[in-house]
């Protein structure tokens, strides 16, 4: 007889190898066929809503690791909420307007922009955006992200644009929208204004100059001919100078040096003297800043007046304490210039070239004008010092080229009238991490008006008409009419029709006696697009609600979407569009460096999915502390793949060992399970509670470690290890075997559900092998519930103590193995000399302790004092390990002196002989 045939070995079709790159697309195909998203929504209908509102990625290019991190985190939350008592719809979105698409067409696609109308160019932009959406959609779906992919929201869709117009109109009605000429961030490389959110800082080398302005009218405080010293790193703005700002409360000195007298802040004399190179100098007069007001100096190049003004923005951090002021090129300059009635002079055009308002420099690119301007200052004797510095300077986030401040006529959203409401809304929102609140609060507190106009083609037009007298027209009637036109035809109609055709029929206005109108040519900042999604998506879609429960984006969105969304929402509704905001860090390479093509360290999601599979990428997301910056590399992914393998192998072992188990008739009631089996269910209860709480708190790394540890420690290295001696060896219906199978079944079912939001492909693959479930997918179930287990606290304490004793036994066996006393642990003979506590513990355990230790012989040999000298000492007592006497049983591989006692089965121990005789002999 072949005794192998009498062993109940595991049987499962669940493969050992994941083969995820090939298997996942098949699983996703099944999800598509069954329309899993709709099935989940139908199942959870009527439950409390949980809405995670998708911040729209920009529709350009392949997805990168930042996208993958973001979408997978969202998917964890939506999936876990729909398994935790909520109705959790997820509508993905795309941001589709703006410069990158224009640039992609004109640069890469060789579109001749100047040879077509605006409307024709915009049609090409729209086509391109849709192509990009399709590409990204396929990549997001490949990640296993579940959502309403057939009905996403897209900012270029007519229904979205129509609602955006309503948001603009409502803000205009409340007086928050105005047109004004003031300095804004201007990108010569994009030929457009930029919002603060579109600025990033990079180091730049700039000239650093000290310039003397001669006093023309000292107002009896200064002497004519004395020189006020300014410092600037933008010589190109000197032609635009109209004034000099000083701080009213600072002390200023007249310093005699080299035959001239110079005016500067007293606190900065030494640093200025050193920078300019005064050999010896002395203070001949001091005066308060406020006494210098209205003094008139002379512009060093043009001889015009330069007025001394008082400004609280002046500091002694650097420079001279006398600040060169060009109202057309700086925010503080503009504000103080308005106060003192100065013109807004801006001698730089949209391409960054000097205009005729800068005589002698017209036509020069502003940066190239620095040198000739400095040379002219030197010729006039006004240049005191030229040097160069490297400093952090604002750049256009798209073109990576420097920006300037440039005064132009722009449309603005003013937040000053509702800033307090905004700050209150920030305080009422739940922020994770908590520092997010401070970050956004300070941004809003310190923020100026928001420049919302852009001088580009691809975007939502600013819905403003102009009367013949130049008066802008924004009324309820015009806004509603334009909104309806956009809903019906899309915003391209604005560029296809004349103003009169876009106005309501019979529209009249006192400013247009001849009935003629023109329309605004600028478009809206793209942040106004996505910032209106709370109205266009949350409010408008029947399956969603405003406010959303959660916005979840990268930490760069405090200045972006989190900011624009709350600004428009509070302006229109008085409330934040979200109850909670969660932010994540950036994806870096394995060494913590930013990914860049030049470094060659870019990790691409598609490559990871082709090599490892989406579930490995998702498990990586679960493993990291995502609220900070996260690292990803081949080596890191290989470590994650090992954890995946452990989880998968656990599934396979548990499933293989319940092949002949029918829960309806074979399950043992929980109170009738052996204590060691109850112990595993108690540990499973703890895991269920821990994992559910972690999903609730978005703490996915806790789940990653908890599930891995449970599989590796409680199951693999303890329970599943000694289980083999029961589930393989005993007869099919043995109570101990059915007891363990009951635990295997409960545990496997719970584990598959617990891990399903993180590893949806693997969980559903395992689910498809279950014969005892009615649902087509694990996604159509809820998180497992904990079981009531009698005397759980006492059982857990008892077996936790036992595990400490077992650790000592394992160490003793390891030492004996190293000393060649034994080979495998299963052939060992153990003699324990336990301390009082361990002795009491051993006598309280009803199970076969020898089986729990997986050894052939076990004896309790009295007290520690009775132990022989060669015994190993541990905290729980002393242990002697020897080779068990006897022969090895052919069937259970344990050593016994009783092998062959049954003459029919001379190779078996009495236990195995009894099983074979009773259950396997005809």
Curated annotation (Swiss-Prot):
Q: Which UniProt keywords apply?
A: Aminoacyl-tRNA synthetase, ATP-binding, Cytoplasm, Ligase, Metal-binding, Nucleotide-binding, Protein biosynthesis, Zinc
GO biological process annotations for this chain's record? Answer: isoleucyl-tRNA aminoacylation
- Please give the subunit comment from the record: Monomer.
Instruction: Give the cofactor note.
Output: Binds 1 zinc ion per subunit.
Q: What is this protein called?
A: Isoleucine--tRNA ligase
Q: What is known of its domains?
A: IleRS has two distinct active sites: one for aminoacylation and one for editing. The misactivated valine is translocated from the active site to the editing site, which sterically excludes the correctly activated isoleucine. The single editing site contains two valyl binding pockets, one specific for each substrate (Val-AMP or Val-tRNA(Ile)).
A single GO molecular function term of this UniProt record: zinc ion binding
Pfam families, A to Z: Anticodon_1 (PF08264), tRNA-synt_1 (PF00133), zf-FPG_IleRS (PF06827)
Where can this protein be found? Cytoplasm
Stated role: Catalyzes the attachment of isoleucine to tRNA(Ile). As IleRS can inadvertently accommodate and process structurally similar amino acids such as valine, to avoid such errors it has two additional distinct tRNA(Ile)-dependent editing activities. One activity is designated as 'pretransfer' editing and involves the hydrolysis of activated Val-AMP. The other activity is designated 'posttransfer' editing and involves deacylation of mischarged Val-tRNA(Ile).
Q: What class of enzyme is it?
A: ligase
This protein's gene is called ileS
Enumerate the PROSITE patterns for this protein.
AA_TRNA_LIGASE_I (PS00178)
What reaction does this enzyme carry out catalytically? tRNA(Ile) + L-isoleucine + ATP = L-isoleucyl-tRNA(Ile) + AMP + diphosphate
Q: Does the keyword Ligase apply?
A: yes
Where, by residue number, does L-isoleucyl-5'-AMP bind?
553
The record lists the organism as Bacillus licheniformis (strain ATCC 14580 / DSM 13 / JCM 2505 / CCUG 7422 / NBRC 12200 / NCIMB 9375 / NCTC 10341 / NRRL NRS-1264 / Gibson 46)
Which InterPro entries has this protein been placed in?
aa-tRNA-synth_I_CS, aa-tRNA-synth_Ia, Anticodon_Ile_BEm, Ile-tRNA-ligase, Ile-tRNA-ligase_type1, Ile-tRNA_ligase, M/V/L/I-tRNA-synth_anticd-bd, Rossmann-like_a/b/a_fold
Give the protein's cofactors. Answer: Zn(2+)
* Binding locations of Zn(2+): 889, 892, 909, 912
Q: Which HAMAP family match?
A: Ile_tRNA_synth_type1 (MF_02002)
Taken from the UniProt record, the cysteine pairs bridged by disulfide bonds within this chain are: none
Q: Which Gene3D superfamilies match?
A: 1.10.730.20, HUPs, Ile-tRNA synthetase CP2 domain-like, Valyl/Leucyl/Isoleucyl-tRNA synthetase, editing domain
